């Protein structure tokens, strides 16, 4: 099953809950589908937090057009499972169901993995601070009279080191 649209994410979540699937030939009412798509949009907005939260690549609907089930979701393939498992946990009470322990565990693990991926992508390579000595074993640095690591470099290499000391 290819999960390309927001409606596909909702159907996958409902399939995990056992509410609707192609195997049982049960379908979801259009209003229930729209409610679930709205829940998906709200959940992804909570996760995203204006760029400070989890980055999944989700494409939000614009203010003029409400989210529709045919809209592309834009998620990275590594985020799809975590999203529809968490959506299943979120919409289960709407159908008077309780998500199984496996769905809850998979949702939790998937969201933690997305947090880790986002944190790793945001982390920058931190150089040694300029107060850190190079050490006596670093013979090349000692030959050049470099006794400390250079630390962060100036963004503009033409800026003199003594700028502003005058």
Swiss-Prot record:
| Cellular component annotations (GO), alphabetically ordered | virus tail
Q: Which InterPro entries match?
A: Gp4_sf (IPR038258), Tail_accessory_Gp4 (IPR020362)
| Location (main, coarse) | virion
Q: Which domain of life is it from?
A: Viruses
Protein's cellular compartments: Virion
Q: What processes does the entry annotate via GO biological process terms?
A: symbiont entry into host cell via disruption of host cell envelope; symbiont entry into host cell via disruption of host cell wall peptidoglycan; symbiont genome ejection through host cell envelope, short tail mechanism
Concerning Gene3D superfamilies, the annotation shows: P22 tail accessory factor (Gp4) (1.10.3230.20)
Identify the keywords attached in UniProt to this record, alphabetized: Degradation of host cell envelope components during virus entry, Degradation of host peptidoglycans during virus entry, Hydrolase, Late protein, Lyase, Viral genome ejection through host cell envelope, Viral penetration into host cytoplasm, Viral short tail ejection system, Virion, Virus entry into host cell
Q: Short name of one Pfam family for this protein?
A: P22_Tail-4
State a single Gene Ontology molecular function: hydrolase activity
This molecule's function is given as: Tail protein that binds the portal ring and functions as a head completion protein. 12 copies of gp4 form a structural ring at the bottom of the portal ring. Together with gp10 and gp26, gp4 is required for stabilization of the condensed DNA within the capsid; perhaps by plugging the hole through which the DNA enters. Plays a role in ejection of the bacteriophage DNA into the host cell at the initiation of infection. Functions as an exolysin that catalyzes the cleavage of the glycosidic bonds between N-acetylmuramic acid and N-acetylglucosamine residues in peptidoglycans.
Q: How does it assemble?
A: Monomer; homododecamer upon binding to the portal ring. Interacts (via C-terminus) with the portal protein; this interaction participates in the head completion. Interacts with the Tail hub protein gp10. Interacts with the tail needle protein gp26.
Comment, domains = The N-terminus changes its conformation when transitioning from the preassembly state to the postassembly state.
Quote the protein name from its UniProt record.
Head-to-tail adapter protein gp4
User: Which species is this UniProt entry from?
Assistant: Salmonella phage P22
- Lineage in the entry? Viruses, Duplodnaviria, Heunggongvirae, Uroviricota, Caudoviricetes
């Amino acid at each position: 099953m290819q999960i390309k649209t927001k409606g596909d994410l909702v159907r996958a979540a409902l399939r995990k809950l056992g509410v609707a699937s192609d195997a049982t030939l049960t379908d979801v009412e259009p209003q229930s589908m729209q409610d679930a798509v709205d829940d998906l949009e709200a959940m992804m907005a909570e996760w995203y937090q204006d760029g400070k939260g989890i980055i999944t690549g989700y494409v939000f609907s614009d203010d003029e057009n409400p989210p529709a089930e045919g809209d592309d979701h834009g998620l990275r393939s590594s985020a799809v499972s975590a999203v529809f498992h968490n959506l299943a946990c979120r919409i289960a009470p709407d159908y008077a169901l309780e998500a199984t322990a496996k769905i809850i565990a998979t949702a939790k693990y998937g969201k933690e993995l997305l947090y880790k991926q986002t944190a790793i992508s945001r982390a920058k390579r931190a150089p040694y601070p300029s107060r850190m000595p190079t050490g006596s074993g670093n013979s090349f640095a000692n030959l050049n009279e470099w006794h400390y690591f250079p630390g962060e470099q100036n963004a503009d290499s033409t800026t003199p080191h003594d700028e502003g000391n005058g």
